[in-house]
Each structure stands twice: as structure tokens, then as C-alpha cells.
């Protein structure tokens, strides 16, 4: 593991050695995996633990040959609302495949103060998050991808301006602004 911006980077996408099948792992979602319907299909045993905010990071749409997808990158003074899921080993393997880890996204560990979904109680937990490789360029997402993410934002009661700001930046950087 290496440190970056105060976070530990988990090299590659293999599961942590010694991870017990009974141990809970906490996964941070900020994009399409906020969508409850989609997560139920992809990771049927995952459970929503709560919500949190990643401070000093911003939400961006970045691209590949197949389109533009959300990622987060460090930016002082910014923040990103997230949901935190408990996942099993099988769920994490499904997420690795979906996220294209380690080629498209890589994993980082971070500690977050998570507000429990049922109790509202704040708990500090070590979680993992997928982050797109930084050299990817800003891109314009498909409407269907944005809708999927927006459904998740609505489900969790997140302010939609974070998503809108990421879209506006993508359009401006692509040269489509008036």
C-alpha cells in the first residue's frame, strides 16, 4: 500500500489478504452504484449502511471509449456526498468486474464518518472506494447514465447540484458552452 493525499492506496483490485468471509467490508458509492435497483441486481447481498461526505474531493465525469463515468479527485474545499454499503467478498468481486478494476478504476481505502441509515448515529469506518485513473480526460456522459446516477441521488436525498456541476464542467471542457 502507498499513501496519497492522506489515503491508503490498495494496489490492484485483489481482496485484502486475511479477509474473513464474515468480516464486513464497507464500499463507498458516489455514482451509478447509488442506484438502489442497480445495486440489488449487481450485489444482491449488499446492504446500505449509511451516508457520508468525502471532504476535499470533487465529482467529475471522465471518459473512455465506451463513454464518460463519474469519478472523484482531490480538490481542496470541495466535497462529495456518498452512500456506504456493507459488501461480501462476492459483492466486491462483482464490483471489481463492473468498475474494470484495476485497468479503468483502482481502489483506495479511506476512513469516513458514516451516518447510520436507520439510527442516524455517526460511526468512523475504514471503507474502500473506486477512483478512475487520473490521466483519463473529462468527458460528457450519456443521458441514461446521468439518469441512473440521479435516481440514486434522489433515493439518498443528496443535493443534485453536485451532479449538475460535474455535467456543467464536462460540457465546458468539451467546448460546448455558449
Residue spans for each PLM region:
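Initiator methionine at the very start of the polypeptide chain
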Residues: 1, 21-22
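Intrinsically disordered/low-complexity terminal segments and short unstructured peptides
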Residues: 1-2, 70
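N-terminal amphipathic/hydrophobic targeting modules at extreme N-termini
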Residues: 2-13
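Short, Lys/Arg-enriched N-terminal segments with co-localized hydrophobic residues
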Residues: 11-21
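Glycine-aromatic micro-motifs
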Residues: 22-178
